[in-house]
Curated annotation (Swiss-Prot):
The modification N-acetylserine is found at S2. Pfam families: THAP4_heme-bd. Belongs to the nitrobindin family. Heme-binding protein able to scavenge peroxynitrite and to protect free L-tyrosine against peroxynitrite-mediated nitration, by acting as a peroxynitrite isomerase that converts peroxynitrite to nitrate. Therefore, this protein likely plays a role in peroxynitrite sensing and in the detoxification of reactive nitrogen and oxygen species (RNS and ROS, respectively). Is able to bind nitric oxide (NO) in vitro, but may act as a sensor of peroxynitrite levels in vivo. One of its GO terms (molecular function) is metal ion binding. Binds 1 heme b group per subunit, that coordinates a highly solvent-exposed Fe(III) atom. It comes from Mycobacterium tuberculosis (strain ATCC 25618 / H37Rv). This is Peroxynitrite isomerase 2. The lineage of its organism: Bacteria, Bacillati, Actinomycetota, Actinomycetes, Mycobacteriales. It catalyses: peroxynitrite = nitrate. GO terms for cellular component: plasma membrane.
Length: 226
């Protein structure tokens, strides 16, 4: 399965092609014409700050989360998965929001697609929180990412990781707990990155029955909000 999560818009040696910076800025401005005015629904009668997936609206992003700022938004697109019944394609929406607190809200849902790209059935779903914490393996380091997820398939997963660059992040499962009705899964490794065109791309590998990491999910999602 292809990824793209580790790529960027630079050429060989990290040098931008002539004019590519101007084109990237122009493309970003054009995209923002559609996405900048959108946000996620919110109840306006609650006494707490509303969740926002648009950095132009709502509470200011907590300073502790600045290294995760590019993730905030609503992302939609398609990807490829590998399951017990073989490879498949899926559609996906990821909502990354905040309320000014020291964490990001994360909600991802996907749906399987037919060979012609039509909706087939519900897919994977997860919800949780991103935050920065003291590195559990190095108390003097404060740039460890903690991602806590609850999966609709019946398990809870704790990831730790680090920023790889200003726009890419790598995480690995540290702990996993399964409910009595939950599916049996192994730990995972995830890589997220903002790639050329401003899209969010990621790859996930999971430990199989033989104890090795194997490709599980990959997708490239375009910004819909923010």
């Amino acid at each position: 399965m292809s990824s793209g999560a580790g790529s960027d818009a630079t050429g060989a040696g990290g040098v931008h092609a002539a004019g590519s910076g101007d084109r990237a800025v122009a493309a970003a401005v054009e995209r923002a014409k559609a996405t900048a005015a959108r946000n996620i629904p919110a109840f306006d009668d609650l006494p707490v700050p509303a969740d926002t997936a648009n950095l132009r609206e709502g509470a200011d992003l907590n300073n502790a989360l600045l290294a995760l700022l590019p993730l905030v938004g609503v992302w939609r697109g398609e990807g490829e998965g590998r399951g017990p019944d073989g490879d498949y394609r899926f559609g996906q929406q990821i909502v990354v929001s905040h309320d000014g607190g020291d964490y990001l809200n994360w909600e991802s849902r996907s749906w399987r697609l037919t060979a012609t790209g039509d909706y087939q059935e519900p897919g994977l779903r997860e919800a949780g929180f991103w935050r920065f914490v003291a590195d559990p393996y190095d108390p003097s380091e404060s740039q460890a990412i903690e991602l806590l997820l609850a999966h609709s398939a019946g398990y809870v997963e704790l990831f730790y990781g680090r920023p790889r660059t200003q726009s890419s992040w790598e995480l690995v499962t540290d702990a996993l707990a399964r409910s009595r009705s939950g599916v049996l899964v192994g730990g995972a490794k995830r890589l997220y990155g903002i790639v050329e065109g401003g899209d969010l791309a990621y790859v996930e590998e999971r430990v199989d029955a033989d104890g090795g990491l194997v490709p599980h999910l990959s997708a490239r999602l375009s910004r819909f909000v923010g």
